[in-house]
Amino acid sequence: MNNKKTATNRKGMIPNRLNKFSIRKYSVGTASILVGTTLIFGLSGHEAKAAEHTNGELNQSKNEATAPSENKTTEKVDSRQQNNVEQSTTSNQPKVNESDNTSVKETTEEPQNTTSTQPTKKNNDATANKDNLAAQNISTQANDVSATPKTTTIKPRTLNRMAVNTVAAPQQGTNVNDKVHFSNIDIAIDKGHVNSTTGKTEFWATSSDVLKLKANYTIDDSVKEGDTFTFKYGQYFRPGSVRLPSQTQNLYNAQGNIIAKGIYDSTTNTTTYTFTNYVDQYTNVSGSFEQVAFAKRENATTDKTAYKMEVTLGNDAYSEEIIVDYGNKKAQPLISSTNYINNEDLSRNMTVYVNQPKNTYTKETFVSTLTGYKFNPDAKNFKIYEVTDQNQFVDSFTPDTSKLIDVTDKFKITYSNDNKTATVDLMNGQTNSNKQYIIQQVAYPDNTSTDNGKIDYTLDTDKTKYSWSNSYSSVNGSSTANGDQKKYNLGDYVWEDTNKDGKQDANEKGIKGVYVILKDSNGKELDRTTTDENGKYQFTGLGNGTYSVEFSTLAGYTPTTVNAGTDDAVDSDGLTTTGVIKDADNMTLDSGFYKTPKYSLGDYVWYDSNKDGKQDSTEKGIKGVKVTLQNEKGEVIGTTETDENGKYRFDNLDSGKYKVIFEKPAGLKQTGTNTTEDDKDADGGEVDVTITDHDDFTLDNGYFEEETSDSDSDSDSDSDSDSDSDSDSDSDSESDSDSDSDSDSDSDSDSDSDSDSDSDSESDSDSDSDSDSDSDSDSDSDSDSDSDSDSDSDSDSDSDSDSDSDSDSDSDSDSDSDSDSDSDSDSDSDSDSDSDSDSDSDSDSDAGKHTPVKPMSATKDHHNKAKALPETGSENNGSNNATLFGGLFAALGSLLLFGRRKKQNK
């Protein structure tokens, strides 16, 4: 910069010359505003092998017959996951006692009936809960479930209550059969019995066999809480075992969390599942499941027959032919089977076939003896039907009673032993009879018994006393409740504690959408729900016991103070609390939250013109500076730009650690940091900050313009050269003689003009450097040469005149201009070098000759030569005089010669 000023001052502004200027442009980089949140999804693997919890009893009878073949309509999966299932056994032991008056000895058949059950996680003492003996739950547990937890809180929808009712408003979900995808579907016989004749595996319904429905599944991420999908079972296939399927059928993951709650409709043989808030908390949900199933006895009625077992899971259909055998022995005068176990009260619904062979008896007394069970005479469910068609003894022990004759009122049923024994005289006054009967009765669990329970039948005839026994073993892990036990409710309220005092005030309102999970004393999940629009939740149908309730924390809320005050009904019990039910509802389990305060940070980016690192009142903000905010993990959670006043800010921040990053504008340098009070200094390009329950508007940064260097070099060189040469020559001659006149004029004009201009400019700098070098070189050379030569000759004689004129003009003009400019600094360098060199050379040469001749006599020879010479400014008088005298002598000689010729002529 200084060099340029010096050159300009020396030469000034030269007209008609190139004058250059360097203009530096200041710019500030800009960036677009980007404020957003990244959702980070973590990975969570849920793997375990678990099947549907089934607490079942299957009647087992030893049937000697062979089995038909098994045909499948679709290919079976080769590898099957099977869970170990504990068995409960029903032992049917017909005891044939030989009468005193007969020599015929009948053999005793002892078919062993075994039920297979899937234990749940809850272990109930078999002696304390007799109702556990026969139940087989249908709550399906998924195997190898995997899901990715969602890190963002999604506001849940209120769920339809299934197993447990709550006060939450029911959610009308959408059927998403097309979004739940099933594969590797299979219906397998668990255990099974191989027919020794055919080699085929058969399903023996009364001998410990069950069917297992298996499949893998995936759930689309678009599925939400409240959405539904269905399992549709075919004509010969249903969920459950000998125990009827529960109306409630839940789908669990491997950890026991409920993914979906199912409601079974026996009328349509369909289970409708409703997704819980689990699908709102996790993505990429997939897994597999096993579900205990059974032949639908009222339709699949005949032994050794293959029935097509069909199921449609979502939109995926599957079918397989299964050979069914119930073990009915048509030659046996007394045989019984557990038709089904009621899922609600666990009562045994028994069917007894009497006198299938149609024997004739004179004595026929039927006695039922219960152990662990009792009859309820008031229920009037002890029925006696007379058989009119042998085909009414269906193998499945599920006769169509509408086609039978109800003759119960014709017989006297005598109850004894505290309603644990019932006796009927089937002769009813007749002397003999071959009538056939189907007897149905219901046995209710007796909680006072410590025995696992059994039901014994005897038919005392005049020929033989026949016996048949149905026994049941307990199933460990069954969570089946006592059918006679009273049910209670548990729950209450989740509210917003606006004043943060931990107490429910009248003006404070409930919070909708909080997830609530109910667990038993062993930590097993029993149910889950979501608070309704009033913050209410409730679990119903619970027995006496200890439960735990877990509350989720909605995004933007913080749990309030726990157990404030002395009134448990209006305080907050925290995120996890324990509730005890003892012969009454417990509606005191509440949880309070207050909105988590949000904070802001930011402030100012300014131009520190005096470079002192302090914000002065005269210094202004810089617009368009990009500012990035990171959380403690280094994740970008927001970006912005300073406004026209240099201000910026980030809002809605939780207490925590953050980092603010300023992006340096182009062409500016960071000013000094931490030079004064925190709200007036510069904090640097990256600033760590911790917010603890307050805003922070002290995060500033300053910049100043980078230093620049200008170097200008001007060089002007002017060279003027003028050379003039004039030459005049006049010659007059009069003569009568011959005259020769030679005039030579030489004019040489040489003009050399050299102009050299060198301009070097070197500059190193981190700032901006402008170097202008102008060099003007003007060289003018004028060379004029004039030569005039006049020669007049009058003579009668001969005259020779020679005139030589030489004029030389040399002009040399050299102009050298060297300009060196060196500038070293931390700057950028721009160097412009202009060199102008003008060289003008004018050479004029004029030669003039004037020779007027006036002959006085004949001229023999006349030569006139003239050569223009440059005008030199001098006269050649000697040459003129010589010419004059030469002319005189020539004229005199001519006269003398002329006189002699005249004399001779005379």
Swiss-Prot record:
GO CC annotation terms, alphabetical: extracellular region
Pfam families given in the database record: Big_8, Gram_pos_anchor, SdrD_B, SdrG_C_C, YSIRK_signal
Region (Ligand binding A region): 51-486
Compositionally biased tracts (Polar residues): 56-71, 80-119
Signal peptide as annotated in the record: 1-50
UniProt keyword Repeat, yes or no: yes
Residues that make up the propeptide removed upon maturation: 873-906
Highest taxon, organism lineage: Bacteria
Ranges of biased composition (kind: Acidic residues): 676-686, 703-845
Keywords, comma-separated and alphabetical: Calcium, Cell wall, Peptidoglycan-anchor, Repeat, Secreted, Signal
GO BP term (any one): cell adhesion
Domain (CNA-B) ranges: 487-597, 598-708
InterPro entries xrefs: Adhesin_Fg-bd_dom_2, Adhesion_dom_sf, Fibrogen-bd_dom1, Ig-like_fold, LPXTG_anchor, SDr-like, Sdr_B, SDR_Ig
Quaternary assembly: Homodimerizes; via N2-Domain. Interacts with host NRXN1; this interaction mediates bacterial attachment to host cells.
Function text: Cell surface-associated calcium-binding protein which plays an important role in adhesion and pathogenesis. Mediates interactions with components of the extracellular matrix such as host NRXN1 to promote bacterial adhesion.
PANTHER family, alphabetized: TOL-PAL SYSTEM PROTEIN TOLA
Protein name (record): Serine-aspartate repeat-containing protein C
